[in-house]
């Protein structure tokens, strides 16, 4: 994928960039792998806003992606690389020997016509899914399970990957994109290679309207609100926060305060935190 820029015919176009979608080989999705996606406007069943700065956006159909990769000993052929509006990565349409179709995350280098497999005996090549115990040290992986059979949860966005560093009993030591090193059960599965479409992070959206198409609403600073709307609000002109620490709209400390539960069960699997030197 390459990044495409535009002539500055307007203020919104001046710095705008887009993907050239050169890797996309099919523009219409597989109907049997679509599901309805209803928008909530960031409101819950009571009608109350539960997430700020989210609402609207272009209508989308959800693509059913296979994150589990449990169809062992069956070879699948890559029929197409498709765009998925629900994620930053592209997806690959697979057709198995028995005619079953499925979507997977498209790893870097995967092309139409390539063969992919899953299972402990699969080759170590991009797109193949294996238990972590069957993957050599130093290999780049993505779509990593945290619980056996639950499906991949880690390293799924565009350009993401993790690396196997070693083994510790029934666990595999994995370094994630963030720099965090953690233990993952050896029976969990992962897919070989990096997630494709790595240049996605280089896109300049150019204008507010493109973010609205993505379902993002304006993010208003608390310092420009009234004091009844935000702890940072009020004052004459450009006033400071006026408190020992920056606050959330609900009066809780923010901007540096740790939010992870100290008693979270999975903390024991983190060998080194992402911010550790």
Curated annotation (Swiss-Prot):
Gene Ontology molecular function terms on file: rRNA binding; structural constituent of ribosome; transferase activity
Q: Does the keyword Oxidoreductase apply?
A: no
Matching entries from SUPFAM superfamilies are given as:
Nucleic acid-binding proteins, Translation proteins SH3-like domain
Record Pfam families: Ribosomal_L2, Ribosomal_L2_C
Sorted alphabetically, the keyword list is:
Ribonucleoprotein, Ribosomal protein, RNA-binding, rRNA-binding
Q: Which SMART domains match?
A: Ribosomal_L2, Ribosomal_L2_C
- PROSITE patterns attached here? RIBOSOMAL_L2
Cellular component, GO annotation: large ribosomal subunit
Q: Where is this region: Disordered?
A: 212-277
GO biological process annotations for this chain's record? cytoplasmic translation
Outline what the protein does: One of the primary rRNA binding proteins. Required for association of the 30S and 50S subunits to form the 70S ribosome, for tRNA binding and peptide bond formation. It has been suggested to have peptidyltransferase activity; this is somewhat controversial. Makes several contacts with the 16S rRNA in the 70S ribosome.
How does it associate, per the subunit comment?
A: Part of the 50S ribosomal subunit. Forms a bridge to the 30S subunit in the 70S ribosome.
Family of the protein in this entry? Belongs to the universal ribosomal protein uL2 family.
The protein's name is: Large ribosomal subunit protein uL2
Organism whose genome encodes this protein = Leuconostoc mesenteroides subsp. mesenteroides (strain ATCC 8293 / DSM 20343 / BCRC 11652 / CCM 1803 / JCM 6124 / NCDO 523 / NBRC 100496 / NCIMB 8023 / NCTC 12954 / NRRL B-1118 / 37Y)
What is the organism lineage in this UniProt record?
Bacteria, Bacillati, Bacillota, Bacilli, Lactobacillales
């Amino acid at each position: 994928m390459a990044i495409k820029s535009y002539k500055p015919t307007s203020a919104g176009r001046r710095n705008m960039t887009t993907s050239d979608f050169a890797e996309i080989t099919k523009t219409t999705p597989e109907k049997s792998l679509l599901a309805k996606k209803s928008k909530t406007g960031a409101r819950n069943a009571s009608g109350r806003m539960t997430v700020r700065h989210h609402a609207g956006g272009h209508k989308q159909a959800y693509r059913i992606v296979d994150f589990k990769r449990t169809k062992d000993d069956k070879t699948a052929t890559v029929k197409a690389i498709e765009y998925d509006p629900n994620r930053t990565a592209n997806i690959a349409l697979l057709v198995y020997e028995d005619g079953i179709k499925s979507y997977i995350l498209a790893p870097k280098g995967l092309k139409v016509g390539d063969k992919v497999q899953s299972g402990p005996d699969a080759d170590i090549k991009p797109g193949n899914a294996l238990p972590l115990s069957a993957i050599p040290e130093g290999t780049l992986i993505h779509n990593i399970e945290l619980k056996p059979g639950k499906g991949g949860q880690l390293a799924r966005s565009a350009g993401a990957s993790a690396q196997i560093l070693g083994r510790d009993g029934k666990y595999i030591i994995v370094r994630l994109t963030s720099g965090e090193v953690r233990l993952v059960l050896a029976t969990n599965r992962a897919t070989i290679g990096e997630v494709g479409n790595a240049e996605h992070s280089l896109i300049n959206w150019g204008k507010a309207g493109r973010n609205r198409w993505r379902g993002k609403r304006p993010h208003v600073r608390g310092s420009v609100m009234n004091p009844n709307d935000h702890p940072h609000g009020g004052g004459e002109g450009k006033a400071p926060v006026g408190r020992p620490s920056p606050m959330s709209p609900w009066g809780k400390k923010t901007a540096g305060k740790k939010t992870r539960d100290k008693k979270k069960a999975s903390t024991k699997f983190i060998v080194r935190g992402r911010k550790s030197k």
